[in-house]
């Protein structure tokens, strides 16, 4: 377990002590609401694709949907820990399309997400969280590619 620096401790105490002013979200977290929406959209996308599949493939996609929900919860937690609040965010509606179109869409968006998470891994405070999310996103991409290889 790593030690917290004095700035982190100050922010935590500001959240605990109600008589102190609430700190403002750090600049690096300003994009988090969009990332949370992204993760919730992936959750819905995986559920939509799973509904069109069967067996182990559908189960794996439902597991990915649960991972995406967890990613959104982690990102909300980062918002709170950095002095903000847990934003209420709604995912982007998923289009109705064939499985192959949805898989291609999901894969392309996953590559963008991976690029964003790679940039955040150097973060001293939450880098480990971003690394864990990144590893899951990369595993999902590998599965999506395999699945795309089986679609006729």
Residue ranges and their predicted role:
Residues 1-152:
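Non-heme di-metal
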């Amino acid at each position: 377990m790593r030690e917290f620096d004095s700035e982190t401790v100050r922010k935590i105490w500001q959240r605990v002590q109600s008589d102190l002013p609430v700190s403002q979200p750090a600049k690096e977290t300003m994009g988090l609401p969009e990332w949370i929406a992204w993760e919730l959209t992936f959750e819905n996308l995986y559920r939509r694709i799973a509904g069109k599949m069967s067996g182990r493939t559908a189960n794996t996609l439902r597991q990915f949907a649960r991972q995406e929900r967890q990613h959104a919860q982690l990102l909300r937690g980062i918002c709170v820990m950095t002095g903000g609040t847990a934003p209420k965010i709604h995912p982007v509606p998923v289009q109705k399309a064939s499985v192959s179109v949805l898989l291609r869409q999901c894969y392309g968006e996953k590559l963008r997400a991976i690029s964003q998470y790679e940039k955040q891994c150097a973060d001293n405070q939450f880098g480990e969280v971003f690394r864990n999310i990144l590893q899951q996103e990369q595993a999902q991409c590998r599965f999506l590619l395999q699945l795309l290889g089986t679609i006729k």
